[in-house]
Structure formats: C-alpha cells, structure tokens
Amino acid sequence: MKYRTHRCNELSLSNVGERVRLSGWVHRYRNHGGVVFIDLRDRFGITQIVCREDEKPELHQLVDSVRSEWVLSIEGTVCRRLEGMENANLATGEIEVDIEKVDILSKAKNLPFSISDDHIHVNEELRLEYRYLDMRRGQILDRLVHRHKVMMACRQYMDKQGFTEVVTPILGKSTPEGARDYLVPSRIYPGSFYALPQSPQLFKQILMVGGLDRYFQIATCFRDEDLRADRQPEFAQIDIEMSFGTPNDLFPIIEQLVVEMFAVQGIKIDLPLPRMTYQEAKDLYGTDKPDLRFGLQLHDCREHAKEFSFSIFLDQLAQGGTIKGFCVPGGADMSRKQLDVYTEFVKRYGAMGLVWIKKQESGIASNVAKFASEAVFQAMFADFGAQNNDILLLIAAPEDVANQSLDHLRRLIAKERNFYNEAQYNFVWITDFPLFAKEDGKICSEHHPFTSPLDEDIPLLDKDPLSVRSSSYDLVLNGYEIASGSQRIHNADLQNKIFSILELSPESIKEKFDFFIDALSFGTPPHLGIALGLDRIMMVLTGAEGIREVIAFPKTQKAADLMMDAPAEIMTSQLKELSIKVTS
C-alpha cells in the first residue's frame, strides 16, 4: 500500500483533476448538513477533504464516524474550492480533495487537551506528560526542525574550517567541574561508579595532546544542579578545541559560525563582534552577561555621594561600599507608586532601598532632595547625561549587591518601557575573567581548573591569587551566556600549581587527574577551546520562553520526565546485582 502521493502542503490549482492519496491526522472535523469537511494534517501542512452524503452515502457514513487525531489515508480527486470558500491562510487553501476512499490507520482516545487550537493555554506539566501530543500542535516540531537545520549548518561550517567531529565517551570518571555529577554504578566493579560527563573537557584536551589539532562535537552533557528556565540536567553543546592558537585566532572562527547558524533563520549578524573585559562589564552593567540591546549604563556616584549629608551614602562609603545607578530617559513620569514597586524589587537582591532623582523643568524632585545642594544634583545630571524629564535611580550597597540589584532593575525597566526590539540580537565577547573566586572562605575556579592564567598575571599566583586574571572568554547574546571557553594550561607544572592553590591534596590529584597530568607530560601543544550552548541559542533564535521549548523530551523544573515517569525506583534484584543498598 502506498500511503501518499503528496504531502498535505503540496497540492494547488495545478493539481486540479488529479487522483491523489494523502495520509495524516484529523486536525478538524465539521459536518455541515450532509457534507463532511476534514482538515487532514501531516508535519508539512493541512489539506481540506470533503465528502458529500448525496454522492457517496456509504463512504459518508464511514467518514462521519472519524474523530480528532485519528490517522487516515485517503484517496480522492483534487477540486477547486467554490468561489469565496478559499482559505488564504493555507498553502492548499484554493483546493480541496473530493474523497473516494478512506482507510482508518489508527484511532485516538479522547484528548487531554486540544491539538487543533494552539492558542488555548495548556498546563506545562500536562504538555510534558503528553509530549507526543504537544509536538502535534506544531510549534515544538517547527523548533526541532529549525534546530536540525542549525546543527547541519554548524557541521558543514566546522568541516570546512578543518575541524574533525569526534564522539567522546559518555561513561567517564568523576572529576570536580563545579556541579554535581550523575553517577552510574558498575556491575563488573562493585562499589565503583562511572560519571556522566559535565562536558568533554578532559577528553578534548587529550585529543589535542594526541595531535588531532582541531576537534568539534555536538555533545550531550549532564549536570546534577538546581534548574532554571535556561537549565536542564542534560543539555547539548557545540564543543570545540584547537591547537596552536590564541583567542584572537579562535574568535573569528566562532563569529563566522554564529553568522552561519543565524543565517538559517534569515538573520544577518554584523562582524566583528564587540569585546569587553569582565571588569568593564561589571562597571557598566553590573553583570558579566550584559544585555546590550539598550543603554541604561551604570555610573559610579561615590564622588558625588561625598557631598551629601545622607547617612546611608556616608555609611556605605565608610564601609567600602559603592553608590551607583543609571539614568532612565523620560523616566520622570514614574509615579511614587511605581517607584515603591521598584524599591521592593531591588530588595529581593539585597539592596536596602532605592534613591530616585527626577530632572524636571519645574525643578528637582527626589526622595533625598534635602540632603544635598542643587549644585550637587546638577553635577550628577551632567555626569549621567540626563535631560529634562529623565530620572536617576541609585543604590547604595556593597559592590556585589549594588551590581546585582541594578542589573535586574535595568532589565526590568527596559522591558517595561520597550527600550529594545525583541527581534534584536546584540552579541558581546566578555574577556579576562578572574581565574579564581572565593566561596565559603575557600578559593575555587571561576570557570574550571584547566583554564590558563594570563601570562602577565602568572607571577601573582603565589602572592595574590584572587587578583589573577584568566585567559577566558564568554560570548553573551541579549543577556544570555551562549558560549564559554578559555586558553588551556598545557604545562604539567602549572596545572599542578593551580590544583595546589585550589587546595587539592597530592593524593586527590593523583586519584582524579593522574592520567591527565601524565598526558600533559608528553609534549602538549598550546590549545584552547569553547563550548556553545545549543539549547540556549535555539531558545533565543526561536523566541521560546525557556530551553524546554526547544528540546524534544525535556525534564521539568524538578528534573523529572513526566512522560516516562523518571526517575523511578528499580527492582531489588537490580540493586542487588549492582551491590547497592538504598538507605532512604
């Protein structure tokens, strides 16, 4: 049996009079007084099928019994629709198929939600439980097709650039990379475990030691961490590594890769992409992931704050804190009620309050007006570039609190006041991150322990490790980190020194990294790499609300697969075979 001669988006007036066979799902069904209309849908489109009772009574009775989402294969003749009955919203909207034969291939139970009307809001958990039905609503499938095309563009481009695609192991060894590992027990080696890779980091570096020179892979990675809208326990990244290069060699390759990927969606990206150091990003935007679709740059107000008699300003200055803020063009129209809402908003991020200063033709209005002279306010307006009807919003707090609060506030205000176009794509490279950070009183890696320090900062490793900058870089798009990478350490002595600063004992280094240190000791080329978050890129490209919308079978916010009901308990016999006892 041949299931179709055409797809459901292909028939047009040029096919009128042809006998055709179509297969697909019943998208909509209508009985108009003896005339049954069926919208037959496949992945490619919809074709209207018609059956008239007065012409084919037995066939009409069968067709009249079908219901939504039944799978049919029909034969019939292509006809022109009656004048005035055309549907300009369909590629096949000028024709219909007069049915002559129907085969019911599969029936469907009553649906948990509507497939034909994708404007109806459906609870996300219900959508994930019935993901196969959710796919039929169209939007998910469209995004998966776009994802496929982006992946194909990536592979073709990387091949032209001389990169070799290599599949690295999924079962590996647990090594500290920042998040918790997913562990897989070994039946053959009781009490021992594999770890699913958080990234192919060590494997791709060892490929460089092995002389591959240029590697890439669209890799599946796993991290057991708390989830957010743009995080999943398993995710895909475009993983890249190259030998004998510097960031200045790598950046143009990645920039052109971005151009190729976005061209799939018909989006033009201008090159070269701008660059900004980590410190510049923090100073100007309060974050290392700045959204550059709008301005609202931060200004340091500490010198002006010294002229205030406002105790909160003076206390922060005395404690080594900061006073900074930004100017909102036209923001003097903000009501006191709205400013109170913003004040409560920044308190979520640790700020104690929000200072506002309006520049109006009638004069200055501010909640700190009595604490400084008009000359001080005018000097601030000049520094901020404020015009009449603008408002300054300031926060006095420790540096990290002020930055985080202002970062979120500027994003919120920019969105509320339509300061940018959603279809706008602003990239920026962020470079020269700190090599180390301090968490819970301990030094830890800002990226991962295989990142090389900047050459000029290596002497600081012994004296002041927290001031050492790394040869690392992130690519940020519209406030999202979509790629992260670094120059790698290719010297075993330097790698051991970094491990030592991270307070890894010689025993721990030997246990976890002996194979890697050994590899570095056999002649390792300088190398660097990057990983682009494919899920996050697709989220931005398609305008999806989160990465669950661009993944075929995603997990929930609690890392559960509602369709397969995973994770799930396993049989006692399986646990026994793996020498595992469950204690809770």
Swiss-Prot record:
The record marks 32, 84 as: Important for tRNA non-discrimination. Keywords: Aminoacyl-tRNA synthetase, ATP-binding, Cytoplasm, Ligase, Nucleotide-binding, Protein biosynthesis. InterPro entries: Aa-tRNA-synt_II, aa-tRNA-synth_II, aa-tRNA-synth_II/BPL/LPL, Asp-tRNA-ligase_1, Asp-tRNA-ligase_1_N, Asp/Asn-tRNA-synth_IIb, AspRS_core, GAD-like_sf. The gene is aspS. This is Aspartate--tRNA(Asp/Asn) ligase. GO terms for cellular component: cytoplasm. GO terms for molecular function: aspartate-tRNA ligase activity; aspartate-tRNA(Asn) ligase activity; ATP binding; nucleic acid binding. Belongs to the class-II aminoacyl-tRNA synthetase family. Type 1 subfamily. L-aspartate binds at residues 177, 223, 447, 488. Its EC number is 6.1.1.23. It comes from Chlamydia abortus (strain DSM 27085 / S26/3) (Chlamydophila abortus).
